[in-house]
Amino acid sequence: MAIKERIGVVVSDKMDKTVVVAVSNRVPHKKYGKIVGQTRRYKAHDEENACHVGDRVRIRESRPLSRTKRWAVTDVLVAANRP
């Protein structure tokens, strides 16, 4: 099975070595066919604490690292503007 990858935005970086990444997806409604937006939040491992809120990142599936963490940050695509 191929390793899954997602691109999303960091919405929380308050945990040590962990970030919460929101991944948006547009899918058709099952019955009515209207295109609706879905957002899924993944906890991802950030070894160097390099990610901050607002960063656009790529995450990939990994082995379970904790009870809820099964993704890891591979790279920061666009860094957020920080003062």
UniProtKB/Swiss-Prot annotation:
Pfam family, one: Ribosomal_S17
Subunit annotation: Part of the 30S ribosomal subunit.
Keyword Protein biosynthesis listed: no
CDD domains on file: Ribosomal_uS17
GO cellular component, one term: cytosolic small ribosomal subunit
Annotated NCBIfam families: PRK05610.1, uS17_bact
Keyword Thylakoid among UniProt keywords: no
Protein name: Small ribosomal subunit protein uS17
Entry keyword set: Ribonucleoprotein, Ribosomal protein, RNA-binding, rRNA-binding
GO molecular function, one term: rRNA binding
Entry superkingdom: Bacteria
GO biological process: translation
Similarity comment: Belongs to the universal ribosomal protein uS17 family.
Natural source organism: Acaryochloris marina (strain MBIC 11017)
Function: One of the primary rRNA binding proteins, it binds specifically to the 5'-end of 16S ribosomal RNA.
